[in-house]
Amino acid sequence: MIYDTSTDVVVSAVAALYHMAESSHTMQLSVNFKQANHLVQVMHQCSEWGQTYIMETLLFFTPQTGQEAHMLADALSRHVQVHSPTLALTASKVAMFLMNYISDMERMNALGRWIGYVLMPHMKAPPEILYTILTNVLLYIQRRPMVLRLELSHFFCTYNDPEYIKLVKLDILYQLATQSNATDVLDELQSCVTDINENIARKATHMIGRLALKWSLVADPCVAALKTIMQGRADYALQESVMVVKDILRKYPDRYGYIVTMLCDHIPSLYESPAKVSMIWILGHFCDRVEGSTDALHDYTLSFLDESSDVQLALLTATVKLFLRKPKSGGPIVQKILHQATDLVANPDVRDRGYFYMRLLTMDANMATAVVFADAAPEEALDLIQQHVLDQLILHGASLVPLLQQNQPVMMQKVRHRFMPDSPALEPSARPHASTHMHAEPSQYHTMHDTDDEAVY
C-alpha cells in the first residue's frame, strides 16, 4: 500500500505501520532503502501530518552504506517542507540519525548546515514552541559540536524572553563557544549577569566560570568579569562567583592569586553552604599564600558544629592542609576540629573523615601532604552528556522525552526505548551501544540513567 498512487492511502498505511511498531513489543518494523527513498519522493505531496509520519517511519531504515545515508539525506533535504516547527524538528532528527552512518566530513558539514537552515527560521516562534526547538538544538550541538556551527546571534537573550528560554539559551551559547567567538559569548554572559531574575544572573555567572575553564584564551577577561560581579551589590551573584572562582583557581593555581585577597574581604557575606565550601577550600589550599588564612579558618571553626555536613567536611580538609603548611599556627586549630568531628558530630561521613585524618597525620607527614594536596584539576566535562544517552534522546526528538529528561523513569513508562541500529556504516563511537533494531535492547543495555560511561567530547 505504500506504493499506492494515492498519497492518502500511502500516509494511512505508513501511520498504521508506525503506530503498530510503537505500541507492539513483538513487532519490529524494518524499512529498506527502496521503500525509504519512495516515501521521501512522495512526501512533498502529503499534508503536514503525513510528512511527519513518513519521517518518523524513516527511523526504521538502517543504512548499510554511507552512500545510502547520504542519498536519503539529500532526497529529504529536497522534498521536505519545513514551514512548520513540527516538520523542522522531525526533519532535523532524521538528519541527525542519518549522520551516524556518514563518514565523509564534507557531507556531514553540509547536512549540519541544512539542519541550521531548517531550524533557524523558527527562532521567533512562541516561547513554548521555541523552548522545544532550543532543547533539541542543545542536544544536537552536544552530539555534533564540530558539525553544527550555528550563528551565535540567534541565541542571544532578549528582554522579553521567559526565564526558561534564557536558561537554555545560555547553555547553547556555552556549547557554541570557540576560541574565535568566546569574547562575543562572554559579552552576552556579562549582560545577562545584570538580569533582574536571580536564576538568570546565577546561570550567567556560572557560565562565565565554565567559559574560563573551557578556553584559557579568555580566562583573563572572564576573571576580570567575575571580579566586577563580586564588587556589585547582588549577594546571590557573589555566592555564585566564589564557587566558580574556586574551579578557576584549581585549573590555574598560579595565575589569579590576587583575586583570593578580594574573596577574603567578602567572607562575612557568604551564607550559602556551597559558597562557604568553596571559600574554605581556597583558604586551605592556598593557606601559605593568603595573608590571614589562619584567622579566617579559625573563625569558621567557631561555628563548626552548626554548619552543614558539606561545610564540616571542607573545614576538616582545610584545617589539615593548614597544619601541614603551618604546623605551629595550625596545630591547635586542627586538634580542635578533629576532636569535634570524631566526638561531637553525629554525621557518620564527618566522623569517618575525622578518624581518617587523625590516622593519616600520625603515620607520615609526607604521605598526608601527598594525599590532601593531590592534583585538584576540575572536571571540565561536567556539562556533557554521554554519547549513547544523547543518541537515545535525539532518536526521541520532537517529543516530550528531550524536554523531560530530568524525570526519565516516569516519562519512559509508556515510551519504548530507542537505540542506534547497527550496520557496517555505523560510526565506530556509536557501535558499543548499538542494537539489531531501533527497539531492540543492545546486548549491553545502557539507558538514559547510566552515568558510568565516557562523555562526548
Give the predicted meaning of each segment.
Residues 1-2, 28-42, 67-80, 105-123, ...:
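HEAT/HEAT-like alpha-solenoid repeats
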